[in-house]
Amino acid sequence: MSGSAVSKRYASALFDIANESAQLNQVEEELIVVKQVFQNEKALNDVLNHPKVPAAKKKELIQNAFGSLSQSVLNTIFLLIDRHRAAIVPELTDEFIKLANVARQTEDAIVYSVKPLTDAEMLPLSQVFAKKAGVASLRIRNEVQTDLIGGIKVRIGNRIYDGSVSGKLQRIERQLAGENR
């Protein structure tokens, strides 16, 4: 079974547990932290993926590092360690977030702008683009990109809505280049 299929199964099982115990938000937040640590700490990955380190030592390391995690997240990580699949934690996290977003009718969006946007500026963007995306709400993360010149660019999943000045200039350039052929 491929890694993504495996991570989907574990994510689905963890999602069911979190949903039944009304801990969806908490489990999602914990998984995001765990994913960041797994991605940023090469030494941790080396230990978790080393075949000569016993599973009990790996679990002890996780327990000491992430002792405050909910039992369902800890047990999932322990199960992954037992099955030599600790490396799929980042994928599992992404799949869990997708399932949680579907359940909440929410989607994640990135708004690129020339300057940081205030909450008052992001609220109408969230409302307008939630309708375009066909979801109840958007969780917006703002990233500053000075090369936009002005305006904004919104990325929701694999869709991009480009209302930036640089994007408009590029479209005009393509049109003019097409007419001059």
From Swiss-Prot:
Key word Electron transport present: no
GO biological process terms on file: proton motive force-driven ATP synthesis
Entry-linked PROSITE patterns: ATPASE_DELTA
Any one GO MF annotation of this record: proton-transporting ATP synthase activity, rotational mechanism
Any one annotated GO CC term: plasma membrane
Membrane topology: Peripheral membrane protein
The keyword Transport is annotated on this UniProt entry: yes
Pfam families: OSCP
Highest taxon listed in the record's lineage: Bacteria
Subcellular location: Cell membrane; Membrane raft
Main location: membrane
Protein keywords: ATP synthesis, Cell membrane, CF(1), Hydrogen ion transport, Ion transport, Membrane, Transport
Family designation: Belongs to the ATPase delta chain family.
Known partners and oligomeric status: F-type ATPases have 2 components, F(1) - the catalytic core - and F(0) - the membrane proton channel. F(1) has five subunits: alpha(3), beta(3), gamma(1), delta(1), epsilon(1). F(0) has three main subunits: a(1), b(2) and c(10-14). The alpha and beta chains form an alternating ring which encloses part of the gamma chain. F(1) is attached to F(0) by a central stalk formed by the gamma and epsilon chains, while a peripheral stalk is formed by the delta and b chains. The F(1)F(0) complex interacts with SpoIIIJ and YqjG; YqgA is found in the same complex. Interacts with FloT.
Protein task: F(1)F(0) ATP synthase produces ATP from ADP in the presence of a proton or sodium gradient. F-type ATPases consist of two structural domains, F(1) containing the extramembraneous catalytic core and F(0) containing the membrane proton channel, linked together by a central stalk and a peripheral stalk. During catalysis, ATP synthesis in the catalytic domain of F(1) is coupled via a rotary mechanism of the central stalk subunits to proton translocation. This protein is part of the stalk that links CF(0) to CF(1). It either transmits conformational changes from CF(0) to CF(1) or is implicated in proton conduction.
Protein name: ATP synthase subunit delta
Organism encoding this protein: Bacillus subtilis (strain 168)
